[in-house]
């Protein structure tokens, strides 16, 4: 895979994600350039380290599309990977009837599965700088999620035998299928993150809207006294 230069160097992000106690972090003001309308970041995302880490992973995974198109010289369309079936992929966050904490838990459990699947990608592309960045930012995001979710001890984690089975299920004898599986893992990881971000941001906007209605109601029932 071709080398890349990403906006946030690993050491810079590591410093950013270790702020002084009480000092809030500024989340990215805009999503990485070039996202399609289905991937656009929605306003209202939480302004904290988790949001920064999530955007950083997405910035790394999004670079995969151009690299895929260059590798296949346009002969294979990128959305072909959407139809390429990979077993045991984690479920995405439903857009409705799903709370923020439930989505954060789904995101965490999904990332733990993808962290195993990325071993398959590493076997095919051992020198990939994209993969290195995806792993780095994913590990930061996992730590942030572990600090956010409730009852983290109840988070489902794969056993060693389950990890072995997962890698076995994605192992193919021919080179083409192994390579397409590796590409498919990065493709599905990106859109898994996109969908989770959309749900998280929706819940954040819903809370902001509810808080605004409460403030208006209090103001209405308790008008300022005339001097």
Swiss-Prot record:
Coiled-coil portions: none
Signal peptide start and end residues: 1-22
Tissue spec. comment: After induction, highly expressed in spleen. Can also be expressed in kidney after incubation with PHA.
Any one GO CC term of the record: extracellular space
Keywords: Acute phase, Cytokine, Disulfide bond, Growth factor, Secreted, Signal
A GO term, aspect molecular function: cytokine activity
Annotated region (Disordered), positions in chain: 24-45
Principal place of residence: secreted
InterPro entries the UniProt entry points to: 4_helix_cytokine-like_core, IL-6-like, IL6/GCSF/MGF_CS
Subcellular location field: Secreted
Cited PANTHER family: INTERLEUKIN-6
Protein name (Swiss-Prot/TrEMBL): Interleukin-6
Organism in which the protein naturally occurs: Takifugu rubripes (Japanese pufferfish)
Lineage, uppermost ranks: Eukaryota, Metazoa, Chordata, Craniata, Vertebrata
């Amino acid at each position: 895979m071709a080398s890349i230069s990403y906006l946030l160097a690993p050491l810079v992000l590591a410093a950013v994600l270790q702020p002084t106690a009480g000092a809030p972090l500024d989340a990215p003001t805009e999503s990485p350039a070039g996202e399609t309308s289905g991937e656009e970041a929605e306003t209202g995302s939480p302004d904290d380290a988790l949001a920064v880490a999530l955007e950083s992973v997405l910035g790394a995974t999004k670079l995969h599309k151009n690299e895929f198109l260059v590798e296949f010289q346009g002969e294979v369309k990128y959305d072909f990977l959407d139809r390429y079936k990979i077993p045991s992929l984690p479920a995405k966050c439903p857009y409705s009837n799903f709370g923020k904490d439930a989505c954060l838990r789904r995101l965490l459990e999904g990332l733990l599965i993808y962290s195993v699947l990325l071993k398959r990608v590493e076997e095919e592309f051992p020198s990939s700088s994209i993969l290195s960045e995806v792993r780095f930012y994913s590990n930061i995001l996992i730590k942030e999620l572990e600090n956010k979710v409730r009852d983290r001890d109840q988070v489902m984690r794969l056993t060693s035998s389950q990890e072995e089975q997962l890698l076995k299920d994605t192992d193919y004898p021919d080179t083409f299928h192994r390579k397409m599986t590796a590409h498919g893992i990065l493709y599905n990881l990106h859109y898994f993150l996109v969908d989770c971000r959309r749900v998280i941001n929706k819940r954040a906007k819903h809370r902001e809207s509810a808080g605004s209605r409460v403030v208006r109601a209090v103001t209405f029932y308790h008008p300022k006294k005339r001097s």
